[in-house]
Amino acid sequence: MKSCFPTPFLHVSFLEYGPLLWYNTILTGEKRDMGKRIVNWARNLLPGYGWACFLFLAALQLLIFYPNRLLLPYMNKLDLSTVWDARIPFRPAWIVIYLLSFASWAITFVLLFRQRKEHVYRNSAAYLLTLLMTFACFMLIPATLEWPEVTGKDFFSCLVRLVYSVDQPYNLCPSLHVVCSYYCWRCLYDTEGIPRWYRHFNFVFLLLVCCSVVFVKQHVLVDIPAGILVSEIPLLLAKRLRWERLGYAIEERIRKKGQ
């Protein structure tokens, strides 16, 4: 009689092989349930159009911020620091605000991309132009600066050294920290249903971020207004020119191709 088991298991009894089958069945079922839970979580977190815009912009930001760092070391770099920058002291403790900004952006972006489709499409189009303008500034104004020597042994100094070790003194003007923080606050200001306290919190946090980027010597003063302008101009244009129509046009084109 021909065995129903695979060749490697010809000499394994059912009592030995059976539990393995049950284990694989249970494991497969758990993986399937885990996949369903992840899908349900994603749907509850953001609508489909919100995920589409978020993932596209996140990928574009990575493409803008990291690949051009390969070219910048070979370009003639500019020092945009002024006498006022030299008077700003180095304060390692401000690295906490600098790092907490990433969590603040994540929370705010979730709130923004949960809004109505018109709102999401308009803000996404504005952020798209913001990223393109930022990339143009990075290439046309290849600014750099000299980091201070961090010799402290305290916790904050260790964090600063960690940031310096994974970063490079390029892509400075405008400050992406200021760009993202201002964009988040500005979009919250025009969004309905956002608690007033959270809008005020984001404005205060924006001011703290502007201070942190110069106190930890990641940027110079001119990078701050540059970041505000690069964020504000696209938002004004998007609202006046109704750039949400771009999102609707792309959605309609995708729908027609899917038919």
Q: Which residue ranges define each predicted feature?
A:
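C-terminal membrane module of polytopic membrane proteins
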Residues: 220, 226-259
